[in-house]
């Protein structure tokens, strides 16, 4: 990643960020404007914690030890922009409901699933999805289903391993290589896997730079 990309990422993520909207269904989506970067993953994979680490604000995205807490598409943008057509923020981060939470009522799971899939298929300003994978568990069946959906919808995505501090450091390179091999033939997958630990702050700068590069493409 170039020094310029790192500087640009620092300029965006160095600003204060704010929560602007929770979206329980597609009709409540904000008007299409800034580029959107979304975060998908299984329940309790650490999406909210990773967003907080990215923007340097521990309390921005609500975190919980209870799987399935995030039930809406939650929108976050850098502060200081009016939102008018000539003063849009450079990007919006979207925290998506987690999938794969078996204890939630089926109707609730179905509603979350429909919201996520409709959003992924139909949002023209969505530039990239970061699919978070718990480093302790690897890619599961329902992760594969989401990757297949993204491939079918031709939505660019990149795999991000989370909670790498929970496994032995020596195992991280092997896990990165194994994960990359699993997605190698997927048409919409970006051919690089990132590793992060929100708790330790590891890989956060690299993820910021990757997001900035994706937005600039």
From Swiss-Prot:
InterPro entries: G_ENGB_dom, GTP-bd, GTP-bd_ribosome_bio_YsxC, P-loop_NTPase. The keyword Cell division applies. Residues 33-217 form the EngB-type G domain. GO terms for cellular component: cytosol. NCBIfam families: GTPase_YsxC (TIGR03598). Necessary for normal cell division and for the maintenance of normal septation. Keywords: Cell cycle, Cell division, GTP-binding, Magnesium, Metal-binding, Nucleotide-binding, Septation. It holds the Pfam family MMR_HSR1. This is Probable GTP-binding protein EngB. Its cofactor is Mg(2+). GO terms for molecular function: GTP binding; metal ion binding. Belongs to the TRAFAC class TrmE-Era-EngA-EngB-Septin-like GTPase superfamily. EngB GTPase family. GTP binds at residues 41-48, 68-72, 95-98, 162-165, 196-198. One of its GO terms (biological process) is division septum assembly. Mg(2+) binds at residues 48, 70. It comes from the Bacteria. The keyword ATP-binding does not apply.
